From Swiss-Prot:
This is o-succinylbenzoate synthase. The gene is menC. Keywords: Lyase, Magnesium, Menaquinone biosynthesis, Metal-binding. Belongs to the mandelate racemase/muconate lactonizing enzyme family. MenC type 1 subfamily. NCBIfam families: menC_gam_Gplu (TIGR01927), PRK05105.1 (NF003473). Pathway: Quinol/quinone metabolism; 1,4-dihydroxy-2-naphthoate biosynthesis; 1,4-dihydroxy-2-naphthoate from chorismate: step 4/7; Quinol/quinone metabolism; menaquinone biosynthesis. The lineage of its organism: Bacteria, Pseudomonadati, Pseudomonadota, Gammaproteobacteria, Enterobacterales. Its EC number is 4.2.1.113.
Length: 321
């Protein structure tokens, strides 16, 4: 016998979370829970405002239709909406024992630019020291100075930077001007510095700073190609699609010698623990980008190791099915 349940949830966010110039006050999403015989599997569906093409309402409609059909014995195809496809495929992978339990809970800590704060976070990190800095939110010159300061203060630090296509070529050059050329090799990569791929490629050629593709992966004309200056691809499964599609993208990147980084779209603790399992399975040599739980006020259903945030259990969720 099959049972499918759908829950809706909402968590207040940290007051400082701004995405694409809009403040994110709450994180809203859905869970699907599949049960068959003695097995069960969970999945999270949480489109990210400003980044996902689908709205939560569209995702909910598609999810409920799929869940009802599956419960009634059908084998419906996955919906085309990426967040829904990923969440359902995670639930199926858990249900059928296809998502390994081993998880990579290492996280490249998000850094605000205070070296002392970062020192404390990195001191507890085993192995390589990797942190992430969001750039492009302030003046490019300030970003360059902050990055330079961190690289200077922590000699074994590797930084991942994310600009979300915020810069014109001129602003990107202003940033690079303030980063000592001797430190630039310790920028693991800079995600999408400019508004176009061509400008980002030119930036890498001119500065020697490696870049990574993120938003580009979701554009119709994107192809996986090895090219000078491109070091990595950042894969956000909630924005990508099914677990199978994530597998395909990781394999395509690795075949070209590129790093693939599994990265958060600000999922709940349940979704983050599943991303940690996907990362341990598909990208075991690469620290994932999952340091987003602290942006929320609570955990949901499953805990993230060592998080002190309060836990909200199933009983507090809104059942839709």
């Amino acid at each position: 016998m099959r049972v499918s349940q759908v829950y809706r949830w909402q968590i207040p966010m940290d007051a400082g979370v701004v995405l694409r110039e809009r403040r994110l006050k709450t994180r809203d999403g859905l869970f699907i829970r599949l049960q068959e015989d003695e097995r069960e599997g969970w999945g999270e569906i949480s489109p990210l405002p400003g980044f996902s093409n689908e709205t939560l309402e569209e995702a909910q409609t598609a999810l409920l239709a799929w869940a009802q059909a599956w419960r009634d014995g059908a084998e419906p195809p996955l919906p085309t909406l990426p967040s829904v496809a990923f969440g359902i495929s995670c639930a199926q992978a858990e249900l059928y024992g296809e998502l390994p339990q081993a998880a990579d809970y290492r996280a490249a800590p998000l850094c605000s630019g205070d070296p002392d704060e970062l020192f404390a976070k990195l001191a507890a990190m085993p192995g390589e020291k990797v942190a992430k800095v969001k750039v492009g939110l302030w003046e490019a010159v300030r970003d360059g100075m902050v990055v330079n300061l961190l690289l200077e203060a922590i000699p074994d630090l590797q930084l991942r930077l994310d600009a979300n296509r915020a810069w014109t070529p001129l602003k990107a050059q202003q940033f690079a001007k303030y980063v000592n050329p001797a430190y630039r090799q310790r920028i693991a990569f800079l995600e999408e510095p400019c508004k176009t791929r061509e400008d980002s490629r030119a930036f890498s050629r001119e500065t020697g700073i490696a870049i990574a593709w993120d938003e580009s992966l979701r554009e119709a004309d994107f192809r996986f190609v090895a090219e000078p200056g491109v070091r990595a691809v950042v894969i956000k499964p909630t924005l990508t699609g099914s677990v199978q599609k994530v597998q395909q993208q990781v394999a395509a990147a690795h075949a070209l010698g590129l790093s693939a980084v599994i990265s958060s779209s600000i999922e709940s603790s349940l979704g983050l623990t599943q991303l940690a399992r996907v990362a341990a399975w598909l990208t075991p040599q690469t620290i994932p980008g999952l340091d987003t739980l602290a942006l929320m006020s609570a955990q949901l259903v499953r805990p993230w190791p060592e998080s002190t945030l309060p836990m909200i259990n199933i009983d507090a969720l809104e059942p839709l099915l």
